C-alpha cells in the first residue's frame, strides 16, 4: 500500500523547512523588540472552548473543526486558531490577576477542514500576538503596526492595510437590526447568506457570491456609539501620526464572533488578488466570557505558508540573540504622541543602529513614578524620558536603570 500525506496537509523539508525556520526567527526578533513573550499551548483543547469563543454559527465551528472523542469520551478538538487557547492559558494560570498587562506571541500548527488551495492547508502554521490589559486605541494601533512591521521585515513591501470598527455590545445590536431588515429585502441570497441571515447576519457582508447585490447596505459607522467612534478615530490618528496609510473597509467583519471595535486585515497581491496575509482586532469581552477577570485585549495572526509564498522562498535565514529592554516614558502626558512616534521608530529601526532591543511604552495616563516602577518591573536596562523642559530644546533624558544616572541626548541623533 502506498501511503501519502492526507489531503490538505504537506511535508515541509529542504528550502521550505529553512524558510519556515527563518520566518519564525524573524518573527521572534520583531515580537521581542515590541516587548512580547512567547507562549506555547496544546494543539488540542476541549471542543467547547472553541465553540464558546469563536462562535457556534461561524464557518469554523459549523464546518471546519476537527473534533474527536478520547478514550474517556471527552469531546476534544484540534485547535483551529491560536487566540482561544492563549486566552484559556491566560485565565488558567491566573495571569488575568497577576499580570493583566501581558504581551504574548505564539507560533504553531492549526487545523481547519477547508478546501485546499495555494497557501491554504488543512494543517497550517500560524504566527500571532495578543496584547492584554489595554483598552487604549494606542494598543490597536501598535498591533496593526506590529503586523505590518513583521511582514515588511521579511521583504513584503507591497501591501495594503484595511480597518473597520464593529462597534460594541451597546451599539452593534442597533446596526444588526437595521442590517437584517435590509437583507430581508434582497432577493435570491445564496445558501450561506440565508443561513447567516438568521444566525450571524454581519458575516453576510463578507460574502463573495452576493456582494454585488448589496448596493444600499447600511453603514456600521452610522450606528457606532460615541465611545466606539472616539476609539476608532484615535486609532486612525495614531496610524497617521507614524505615516501609515490605510483604507476604511466597512464590509470587513472577520470570521470570528469574539471581535469588538477595531478589526483589520493586511492584504497583498503577492499570493492572489488582495489576499489577506495578516488579520486581527480587538476582543474586549472574551477573557470575561471564558471565566476570567474582565480584561480588554487586541491581537493578530498570520498564516506562515501564505507569507512564505509571498516572500518567494528567500534563501537567506537570519539569527537572533537576547535583546536589551528599553522603556519609553513621558513626564508630560501632552508629549504622549511624540513619545509614541519615537517608540515606533525605535521598534522599526533600533537605536543608533542597535536593533537587538525590546521597546516598551509609552503608557498613557500614568504618572512618571508609576512608569519608572513599571520599567524596573520589566527589568529595563534604560528608560528614555520625554519631559517638557528637555523636549523644548529637542532633547530627551536617558536614564540608566541600574545606577540611576541620566544623560541628555538630542532626539535628532536617533
UniProtKB/Swiss-Prot annotation:
<dbReference type="GO" id="GO:0006427">
    <property type="term" value="P:histidyl-tRNA aminoacylation"/>
</dbReference>
<comment type="subunit">
    <text>Homodimer.</text>
</comment>
<dbReference type="InterPro" id="IPR041715">
    <property type="entry name" value="HisRS-like_core"/>
</dbReference>
<comment type="similarity">
    <text>Belongs to the class-II aminoacyl-tRNA synthetase family.</text>
</comment>
<keyword id="KW-0547">Nucleotide-binding</keyword>
<dbReference type="InterPro" id="IPR006195">
    <property type="entry name" value="aa-tRNA-synth_II"/>
</dbReference>
<dbReference type="GO" id="GO:0005737">
    <property type="term" value="C:cytoplasm"/>
</dbReference>
<dbReference type="InterPro" id="IPR015807">
    <property type="entry name" value="His-tRNA-ligase"/>
</dbReference>
<dbReference type="InterPro" id="IPR045864">
    <property type="entry name" value="aa-tRNA-synth_II/BPL/LPL"/>
</dbReference>
<dbReference type="InterPro" id="IPR004516">
    <property type="entry name" value="HisRS/HisZ"/>
</dbReference>
<dbReference type="InterPro" id="IPR036621">
    <property type="entry name" value="Anticodon-bd_dom_sf"/>
</dbReference>
<dbReference type="Pfam" id="PF13393">
    <property type="entry name" value="tRNA-synt_His"/>
</dbReference>
<keyword id="KW-0436">Ligase</keyword>
<dbReference type="GO" id="GO:0004821">
    <property type="term" value="F:histidine-tRNA ligase activity"/>
</dbReference>
<keyword id="KW-0030">Aminoacyl-tRNA synthetase</keyword>
<keyword id="KW-0067">ATP-binding</keyword>
<protein>
    <recommendedName>
        <fullName>Histidine--tRNA ligase</fullName>
        <ecNumber>6.1.1.21</ecNumber>
    </recommendedName>
</protein>
<keyword id="KW-0963">Cytoplasm</keyword>
<keyword id="KW-0648">Protein biosynthesis</keyword>
<dbReference type="GO" id="GO:0005524">
    <property type="term" value="F:ATP binding"/>
</dbReference>
Amino acid at each position: 500500500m502506498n501511503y501519502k500525506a492526507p489531503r490538505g496537509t504537506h511535508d515541509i523539508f529542504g528550502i521550505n523547512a529553512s524558510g519556515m525556520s527563518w520566518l519564525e526567527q524573524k518573527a521572534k526578533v520583531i515580537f521581542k523588540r515590541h516587548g512580547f513573550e512567547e507562549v506555547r499551548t496544546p494543539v488540542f483543547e476541549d471542543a467547547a472552548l472553541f465553540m464558546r469563543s469563536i462562535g457556534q454559527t461561524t464557518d469554523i465551528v459549523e464546518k471546519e473543526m476537527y473534533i474527536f472523542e478520547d478514550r474517556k469520551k471527552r469531546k476534544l478538538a484540534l485547535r483551529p486558531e491560536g487566540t482561544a487557547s492563549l486566552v484559556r492559558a491566560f485565565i488558567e494560570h491566573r495571569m488575568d490577576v497577576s499580570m493583566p498587562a501581558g504581551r504574548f506571541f505564539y507560533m504553531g500548527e492549526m487545523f481547519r477542514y477547508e478546501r485546499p488551495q495555494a497557501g491554504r492547508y488543512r494543517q497550517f502554521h500560524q504566527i500571532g500576538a495578543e496584547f492584554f490589559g489595554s483598552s487604549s486605541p494606542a494598543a490597536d494601533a501598535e498591533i496593526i503596526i506590529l503586523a505590518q512591521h513583521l511582514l515588511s521585515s521579511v521583504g513584503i513591501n507591497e501591501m495594503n492595510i484595511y480597518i473597520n470598527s464593529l462597534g460594541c455590545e451597546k451599539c452593534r445590536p442597533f446596526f444588526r437590526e437595521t442590517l437584517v431588515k435590509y437583507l430581508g429585502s434582497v432577493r435570491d441570497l445564496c445558501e450561506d447568506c440565508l443561513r447567516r441571515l438568521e444566525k450571524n447576519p454581519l458575516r453576510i457582508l463578507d460574502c463573495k457570491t452576493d456582494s454585488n447585490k448589496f448596493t444600499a447596505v447600511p453603514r456600521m459607522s452610522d450606528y457606532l456609539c460615541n465611545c466606539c467612534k472616539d476609539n476608532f478615530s484615535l486609532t486612525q490618528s495614531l496610524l497617521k501620526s507614524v505615516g501609515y496609510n490605510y483604507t476604511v473597509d466597512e464590509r470587513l467583519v472577520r470570521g470570528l464572533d469574539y471581535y469588538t471595535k477595531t478589526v483589520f486585515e493586511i492584504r497583498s497581491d503577492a499570493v492572489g488578488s488582495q489576499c489577506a496575509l495578516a488579520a486581527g482586532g480587538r476582543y474586549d469581552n472574551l477573557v470575561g466570557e471564558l471565566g476570567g477577570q474582565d480584561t480588554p485585549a487586541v491581537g493578530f495572526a498570520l498564516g506562515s505558508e501564505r507569507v512564505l509564498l509571498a516572500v518567494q522562498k528567500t534563501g537567506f535565514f537570519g539569527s537572533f540573540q537576547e535583546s536589551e529592554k528599553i522603556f519609553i516614558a513621558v513626564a508630560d502626558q501632552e508629549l504622549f504622541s511624540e513619545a509614541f512616534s519615537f517608540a515606533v521608530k525605535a521598534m522599526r529601526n533600533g537605536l543608533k543602529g542597535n536593533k537587538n532591543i525590546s521597546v516598551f511604552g509609552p503608557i498613557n495616563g500614568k504618572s512618571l513614578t508609576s512608569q519608572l516602577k513599571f520599567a524596573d518591573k520589566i527589568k529595563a536596562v534604560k528608560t528614555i524620558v520625554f519631559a517638557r523642559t528637555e523636549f523644548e530644546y529637542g532633547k530627551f533624558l536617558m536614564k540608566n536603570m541600574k545606577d540611576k544616572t541620566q544623560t541628555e541626548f538630542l532626539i535628532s541623533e536617533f
